[in-house]
Amino acid sequence: HELIHFQQKYDGGNLLAACIKEGAADFLAELISGRHINQHVHDFANPHEAELWAEFKQRMHGKDYTGWLYSNTPGRPNDLGYWMGYKITKAYYDKQPNKQAAVQDILNIKNFDRFLEASGYGK
């Protein structure tokens, strides 16, 4: 995960960008290793995906990461934003016919709104 961050050519910003940065690192680490590093977060979030997406959509352009990244929130696991970014990144990767190009795209995102749109996630 941390080695992926070294390869990423972008910084965080709003919640969407920060979550994609973290989730892309998780996704690419899984692609390399074959294992989730945050399985407990996936186990919690997958059954609540629709509700979490609705909540995330309302906040994704803000800079308040509370409840999503780098904080403790009662009733939910830490770092749900990693999971959300993972889901968006995986959706993008799965849609791309050229997987090598998709990895390069993921490492070099310039516009996070366009990346989300291209992923088709949440549609």
Report residues per predicted region:
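A generic structural signal for ordered alpha-helices
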Residues: 3-4, 34, 46-47, 63, ...
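Active-site recognition of the HExxH zinc-binding catalytic motif
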Residues: 1-10, 26
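Amphipathic alpha-helical segments in well-ordered regions
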Residues: 2, 28, 87-91
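A structural motif
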Residues: 1-3, 21, 58
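General secondary-structure propensity
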Residues: 9-15, 71-72
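Post-HExxH zinc-binding segment in Zn-dependent metallohydrolases
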Residues: 12-55
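Pan-zinc metallopeptidase signature
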Residues: 57-123
